[in-house]
């Protein structure tokens, strides 16, 4: 096991993800985690992540110096490397030539972490400071055109100025694997088969004879949660699917059919009127999310009372993932809150259930692998992510039945055309957004003043970062023509070419 100390880098989660892809378990803790807590995890090595601060600044992020008393191998990445240099007596200063993006790495000395790594490769840089002087006992093992000390080592302490965790670093995964396997002595024991077995055992012990209400949205995450729980506790699971009126076209029927195939009893609740009445007049995104979160719990509590004769319901299960938690609140380090997730920040304080989130520490690709391990169909597992608040966060401004219908039809056309063109499985996520703006148009000889639809498609590997999908002009033209001709109330279609960062994948 490797413990990653998070200093606030946007890429910290990718470090854990890359190691897990290699079968090595990695866990993330904030940089200020106590040495005692780290020691309890019994790690075989530490990785210090990158971060936005400068080691020479007054407010620099510094971990407990006691981490060095653990006598564990340490790998510092970007800020982590600069911290090591500063701590051991070297010098770090603001770089005259800052590096952002791809750079050419050249290995200049053999090292165990470079075993099997090409002598020259491209790596990903993202730093404004650089190492000026190495501490005594350290050696430079790689360089780049603008970084003479691009990789350093001293015994079992290593530093990398670049980000091996980012996919653009061609040999990054191999370097991280070498550190974990060859330096730290880790073994490849992490995988979804082991996770499924251990998690089912944990769930059985935690839940015991209690009953669990599982919130099913129809998405991959909640479906995998329900399947995992059903394997673990059988009839003590009450799977509840709430039709809040904010679903995609034909969503309810698809979900019911899929759960029937999985042989999991599903309780469907028609709560459309309740949700829409509470959302009436509400246009602020965060308020919409919180209203939906609170209304979900209200509906679940009512459903729980219907089942009380069969045993008390103590737990509420949700399909919360790592990125959900990261975007809601900084639980792993000094990153900043972006927006609340309906599974986390939107929950009311008066909630009576104990929360259980089996997937909380998993990335999306791991959830799909887990689902495959549990027997969920591949076609379903490859469905694009869908937000818990549903179309409410894809309708900018106030939500209404007419807007929902309009968005459902447009979204259905977009997805249908992606599948016809064999593009659906090539993009990470695709959907439509109904904008809160009207524009002038012409239909026949008549002037129109109607809604605009925005098409959104992104490429990503885990949702932490994303770039817009480069869909062909002819394809976009076809989708636009269909939407404006077939969907009443739409006279303009635009395509979102914003990446994440600076934007988020969803608009609200």
UniProtKB/Swiss-Prot annotation:
E.C. designation(s): 6.3.5.2
Keyword ATP-binding in annotation: yes
Protein residues bound to ATP: 217-223
Active site: 78 (nucleophile), 163, 165
Subunit structure: Homodimer.
MF terms (GO), sorted A to Z: ATP binding; GMP synthase activity
Reactions this protein catalyses: XMP + L-glutamine + ATP + H2O = GMP + L-glutamate + AMP + diphosphate + 2 H(+)
One GO cellular component term: cytosol
Pathway terms, separated by semicolons: Purine metabolism; GMP biosynthesis; GMP from XMP (L-Gln route): step 1/1
Every Glutamine amidotransferase type-1 domain range: 1-189
Record-annotated GMPS ATP-PPase domain positions: 190-383
HAMAP family registered for this protein in UniProt: GMP_synthase
Name of protein: GMP synthase [glutamine-hydrolyzing]
Source organism of the structure: Helicobacter acinonychis (strain Sheeba)
The protein's role, per its UniProt record: Catalyzes the synthesis of GMP from XMP.
Keywords: ATP-binding, Glutamine amidotransferase, GMP biosynthesis, Ligase, Nucleotide-binding, Purine biosynthesis
Protein encoded by which gene: guaA
Gene3D superfamilies found in the cross-reference section: 3.30.300.10, 3.40.50.880, HUPs (3.40.50.620)
InterPro entries: Class_I_gatase-like (IPR029062), GATASE (IPR017926), GMP_synth_C (IPR001674), GMP_synth_GATase (IPR004739), GMP_synthase (IPR022955), GMPS_ATP_PPase_dom (IPR025777), NAD/GMP_synthase (IPR022310), Rossmann-like_a/b/a_fold (IPR014729)
């Amino acid at each position: 096991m490797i413990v990653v100390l998070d200093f606030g880098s946007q890429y910290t989660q990718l470090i854990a993800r890359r190691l897990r892809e290699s079968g090595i378990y990695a866990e993330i803790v904030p940089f200020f985690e106590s040495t005692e807590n780290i020691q309890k995890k019994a790690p075989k090595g530490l990785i210090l992540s990158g971060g936005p601060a400068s080691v020479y600044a007054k407010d620099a992020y510094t971990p407990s110096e006691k981490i060095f008393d653990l006598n564990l191998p340490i790998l510092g990445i970007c800020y982590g490397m600069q911290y090591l240099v500063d701590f051991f007596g070297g010098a770090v200063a603001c770089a005259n030539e800052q590096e952002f993006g791809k750079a050419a790495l050249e290995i200049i000395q053999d090292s165990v972490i470079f075993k099997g790594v090409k002598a020259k490769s491209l790596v990903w840089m993202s730093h404004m400071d650089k190492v000026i002087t190495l501490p005594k006992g350290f050696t430079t093992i790689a360089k780049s055109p603008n970084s003479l000390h691009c990789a350093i080592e001293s015994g079992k302490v290593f530093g990398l100025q670049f980000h091996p965790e980012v996919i653009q670093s061609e040999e990054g995964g191999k370097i991280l694997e070498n550190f974990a396997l060859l330096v730290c002595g880790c073994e490849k024991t992490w995988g979804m088969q082991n996770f499924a077995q251990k998690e089912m055992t944990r769930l059985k012990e935690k839940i015991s004879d209690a009953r669990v209400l599982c919130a099913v949205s129809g998405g991959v995450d909640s479906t995998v949660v329900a399947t995992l729980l059903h394997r673990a506790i059988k009839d003590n699971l009450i799977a509840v699917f709430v039709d809040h009126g904010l679903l995609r076209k034909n969503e309810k029927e698809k979900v019911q059919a899929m759960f029937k195939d999985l042989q999991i009893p599903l309780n469907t609740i028609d709560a459309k009127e309740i949700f829409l009445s509470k959302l009436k007049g509400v246009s602020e995104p965060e308020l919409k999310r919180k209203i939906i979160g609170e209304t979900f719990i209200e509906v679940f509590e009512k459903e729980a009372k219907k089942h009380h004769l069969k045993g008390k319901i103590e737990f509420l299960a949700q399909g919360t993932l790592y990125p959900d938690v990261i975007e809601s609140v900084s639980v792993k380090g000094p990153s900043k809150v972006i927006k609340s997730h309906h599974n986390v920040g939107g929950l009311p304080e008066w909630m009576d259930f104990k929360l259980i989130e089996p997937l909380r520490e998993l990335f999306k690709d791991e959830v799909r692998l887990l689902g495959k391990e549990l027997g969920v169909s591949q076609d379903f597992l490859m469905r694009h992510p869908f937000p818990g608040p549903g179309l409410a966060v894809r309708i900018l401004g106030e939500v209404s039945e007419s807007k929902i219908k309009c968005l459902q039809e447009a979204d259905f056309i977009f997805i249908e055309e992606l599948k016809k063109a064999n593009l659906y499985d090539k993009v990470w996520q695709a959907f439509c957004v109904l904008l809160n703006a009207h524009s002038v148009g012409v239909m026949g000889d008549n002037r129109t003043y109607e809604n605009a639809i925005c098409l959104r498609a992104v490429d990503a590997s885990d949702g932490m970062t994303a770039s817009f999908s480069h869909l062909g002009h002819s394809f976009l033209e076809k989708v636009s023509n269909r939407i404006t001709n077939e969907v009443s109330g739409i006279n303009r279609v635009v395509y979102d070419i914003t990446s994440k960062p600076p934007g988020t994948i969803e608009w609200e």
